[in-house]
Amino acid sequence: MQLQPLTGSLFARTASVACLLTTLVSCTFNSGGQHADVIVVGAGIAGLSAALEASAAGARVLVVEQNSVGGGHAVKAGGFALVDTALQRDKGIEDSPNLAYRDLFRWGKDPDPYWTRYYVTHSAPDVYDWLTDMGVQFKVILDTPESSVPRFHFTRGTAVNVIIPMLRKALLDPNIEFMWNTRVTELARSRGRIKGVFTVNERDGSKTRLNAPSTILATGGFQNDLKMVRDNWPDKTDVPGQLYKGAGKFATGDGYNFTRWAGADMRNMDRQVTFYSGVPDPRDPSAGKGLYAENPAAIWLASNGRRFVNESANSKQIAAAVSELKPMSYWLIFDTKGSRRFSIRDALAANQQTLRDEILGDPELTATADTLVELARQTGLPEHGLKTSIETWNRMIDVGTDFKFKRFSPGNRATYIRAINEPPFFAMRVYPLTRKSMGGPAINIHAQVVDDSGVPIPGLYAAGELAGVAGINGQHGGSGTFLGPSVITGRVAGRSAGLATPADSVTLPYKPDEHDSRDLAATAPDFGLPGYWHYDQVHRLVFEQAYTCDLCHVSDLPKRLANKSAEMQARLNTCTRCH
C-alpha cells in the first residue's frame, strides 16, 4: 500500500464533537475510560503537525508537553529544505524531486529510499503549501553544499516564525487540548497494545494515567543526555573527552526508552549530528551546556599551533578533520577587528550582544593578549607554531591565495578574511557540541513503530527527530533536512492515528483543576522551581535587560499563568521578544 499525499479528499471526515479549549496544569482524570482518540507526546514541530493532522482526520487529540510552551528546539532552529516550491519558481530556481533525491543520496550515502522519495515529492504541497496556508511567510532561499540548487527556505528570522502560526492554529482547534508542564513517565500497555501514557505534573507532582487507542511520540532527540550520546558515539574508541550539550532542554531521550521498552527496532542510533565549535555556557552552573560559537574572521589551530582544515569547508569535511585531532578540540584565533565578527548562534536574540561580550571578556573562556608570545603562554599553544601559523596566514593574505587549504584565492576572498595583526589578539578553545539525532525506533510508511520483524506495535506511532526523521539524512545531516521531514512524519503519524480512531469512539470530558491565579510578578525572584524552566528563562532576561512588565503583559495577557485560549494566543505575540 502506498501512502497518498496529505491533501485532498482523504480528509473529508470532520470532527463531530468540540471541547472547551483550556490550558491544563494539574488534572484529575481518573484512570478508567478514554481521554482522547489520539495522545501526542511533545509539542514541538513534529508533535504540532501530528496533532493538527489527527484533528483534521476527525480525532479528539490531547497533546502532552513537558514545557509550559510549545515549539521545542524549532523555535531556535533555522530553515527547511523544500523542493520545487512557489518561492523557488518566483526566484527563477529550477528544482525537481528527482534532482533533490539524487542530492540527498549523494550527501547522505544511504538515506531511506521510500521516505526520501516521499519527502522530495511531497515537501512542496505538504510542508511549504501547508505552512503558508497557516500564514507562514518564507522569504529567503539559501544555497548549501548538499544541494545542486538553492532549496534552504527561511522566514525572516528563525523557525519561531513557523511555530507561532502552527501553535495559533492548534490553540483555535476545538479538537485539540493541551496538557502543559507534564512529563510522560512511561507508556501504558494492555493486551499487547499501547493504550496511553502515565504522566507526572512537573509543578505539583500529581500523577495521572491518560488513555487513548493511539499514542504518537514526538519527544525529540537524545542530544541533551551526554551519557546516551557517548553510549551511541559512532567510534567507541574515540569518544570526545570534553563534550557539551547543544540540543533543546528537553531532548533527554525519553522517547527512545519508551519505544525500546515497547519492543521497537532501534536503528542507526550512532548517527548523530555534532557541531564542532562549542564553548561552555558561562551561565550554566552545571557546566554541561554549550553554545555554538562562530567567527568567520578566525583561523583554526590544533593543539600543535597549526591550521588543520579550510575553515570555510562543509560540515562533513570539518567533522572528518576535527575527529582526527587529539584531543578533539581546537582554537579560534582572531584579532581586534576579527572580534567584531564573533557571535553566538544559540543565544536568544534579545541578549546576543550581552552574552557575546560576556564570553569575550571571560578569561576562563577567551585568552586575550597584546602579543602572540603572551597569547601562547596563556593558552599553552606552542609559541613557534602559533607565530608561524599567523605569519604564514598574513603572507597568504598579502599574496591573495591560501596555498595550504584553499580557503581563498585571487578574486575569491570575503571581506572579513584579512590579516591577523591588530592587537589585542584573542584565542578561544572550542569543543564538540551535541545537536541532533538521526536514529531511533523504526517506523513503517504509516509512521507506526515496528519491531525487528517489521510488525507494527499496536497503538504506537513516532515522528520527528525521535524517529530519526525517517532516515532521510542517511549518514550525514544536511541543511534543513530535519524541520521539513519532522513536519512530514508528524503529519503522516497524525493522519494514520486519526483515521484509526473507531467510529464509535467516546472520550471523557476534561475536568481541569483551578489554575494558579497568583500575580507572578510577586514570585519572580523564585527561580528554579520545578516546572518553571521557560518562565525562568524569560524572566531572567527581563531582569537582565531591565524590561518593564508591560512590554509583554497587556490586557489580554495578565501577570499570571495563561489559562485561557485567548491568553495563550496573546502570549504567542510575545515570542519574538526573546527569539
Where are each of the predicted segments found?
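Conserved N-terminal/central alpha/beta ligand/cofactor-binding core
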Residues: 59-60, 66-177, 183, 227, ...
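An anion/pyrophosphate-binding glycine-rich loop and adjacent beta-alpha core
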Residues: 256-258, 262-381
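Sequence context of c-type cytochrome heme-c attachment sites
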Residues: 511-571
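Glycine-rich loop(s) and the adjacent beta-strand/alpha-helix scaffold that form part
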Residues: 203-206, 210-279, 477-492, 496
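A glycine-rich dinucleotide-binding beta-alpha-beta segment and adjacent secondary-structure elements
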Residues: 186, 385-470
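Beta1/beta-strand and adjacent pyrophosphate-binding region of the FAD-binding site
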Residues: 32-46, 62
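Helix-rich C-terminal "cap"/substrate-channel and partner-interaction subdomain
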Residues: 329-424, 496, 500, 512-516
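Helical element adjacent to the flavin cofactor pocket in flavoenzyme catalytic cores
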Residues: 155-213, 256, 260-262
